[in-house]
Amino acid sequence: GLVAGLFYREFTKLQDFPEGEYTQLSVAHTHLLALGFMLFLIFLALEKVFALSRHHQLFNSFFWLYNVGVVLTVGMQISHGILTVLGKESNEMISGIAGLGHIFITVGLTVFLVNLGRAIKEPDAGSANASVNA
């Protein structure tokens, strides 16, 4: 996330891109920080309480779907932003791949919520009892 912000600042300066003009590069770092850092801190806390990784198949499905979605979405955001800064038109392919990224994120989050729901309903939540009762 921080590297994306640095890239945005330096790349737009290097290309003499007008300050204040919008490009997808300007929001790529916030997307990476929110989707890649802050949400994973939440996922980590929920893992600690409910031991979600016990359900290996659900957890692995969530992990890979979500991360592939974030990479596709932010990758296309950066590609679109670079094209904007260079004064070139974006095309439908970039929008389509970004849309696939959003779908992967949505499916990944859905799998995560299914896993969380199952873990909440289970009488023994693995590490939850040990850490809550300690």
Regions found by a protein language model. Give the residues of each.
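Hydrophobic alpha-helical transmembrane segments of multi-pass integral membrane proteins
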Residues: G1-A134
